[in-house]
Regions:
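Glycine-rich "substrate-gating" loop/helix at the edge of Rossmann-like oxidoreductase active sites
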Residues: 112-117, 153
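Residue-level signal for the nucleotide or nucleotide-sugar donor/cofactor binding architecture
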Residues: 65, 117, 158, 183-188, ...
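A ligand-binding cleft/hinge motif common to bilobed small-molecule-binding domains
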Residues: 22-34, 98-102, 124, 129-158
Length: 246
């Protein structure tokens, strides 16, 4: 709703909205033909602010002590392992589908309306694992990370092994930033990019972002646009493989 409003808002230099990848590419791809709403390309990228990789986690009480143990059980017992996500066809679900593709395991997805519901479900034993954003994991107590979808060890939780080192070349993450209506004035774009770059370089700001479980990741509008295109192609490939789009 907010992103549809944003693309129709006045491009006066003052209307700005927060955006979240991969959701701004997933929603238009999956929307039924003719249904109104925004298109990804209508959102003018202003800047990327944070990087938040995907991670597979279990409760500390879980019998699964490693990624390998969980995957082997899920392969031997298709559908028996219940996996939380923050909703069908979200970034969490894309991550789950890719883990299934790379490993041959089969999970039963249990979608929740957000991390505030999925996390208690994991800790309370409603589900066996949670395909999550790392920021959610870092704000939790009582959870154990089994594998993170980054190429190299992630500085905010360096003890969690990467998918890459476990033998699966899978990188999956959310990016969050700012966008504006289309036809945004170039002068306003340049001014805001410079001001936001200064804010994002401030040590106090960076400490606050890390304290929220996120990695500061400022990129200007051009670079953020390239990330959006990259994520669009990755999402399209996964959705096609799953038979969800043509």
């Amino acid at each position: 709703i907010g992103w549809t409003w944003l693309v129709g808002a006045k491009a006066d230099g003052y209307n700005i909205g927060g955006v979240d990848l991969p959701h701004i590419v997933l929603q238009p791809m999956l929307r039924p033909e003719g249904q109104p709403g925004y298109k990804t390309e209508q959102l003018n990228p202003l800047c990327c602010l944070v990087f938040d990789p995907d991670i597979l986690i279990v409760s500390e009480k879980s019998p699964f002590k490693s990624f390998g143990e969980l995957i082997e059980y899920a392969k031997a017992n298709p559908g028996k392992v219940k996996a939380a996500t923050v909703g069908k066809l979200t970034g969490d679900h894309i991550f789950l589908m890719n883990v299934e593709k790379f490993t041959g395991a089969q999970f039963t997805q249990v979608p929740y309306p957000g991390g505030s519901k999925a996390a208690p479900a994991l800790l309370g034993g409603e589900v066996d694992c949670y395909f999550a954003s790392t920021s959610n994991f870092l704000r939790m107590q009582g959870a154990r990370g089994l594998a993170i979808a980054t190429k190299d060890r992630y500085e905010l939780c360096p003890d969690v092994p990467t998918m890459n080192e476990l033998g699966y070349k899978l990188e999956s993450a959310k990016y969050r930033g700012l966008a504006t209506p289309p036809n945004f004035p170039a002068e306003a774009q340049a001014y805001l990019e410079a001001a936001l770059a200064k804010v994002c370089a401030d040590p106090e700001y960076q400490a606050g972002v890390r304290g929220a479980g996120l990695l500061p990741y400022y990129r200007d509008g051009k670079a953020f646009g390239e990330i959006i295109e990259q994520e669009k192609e990755k999402a399209r490939k996964t959705l096609k493989e799953q038979g969800l789009i043509q």
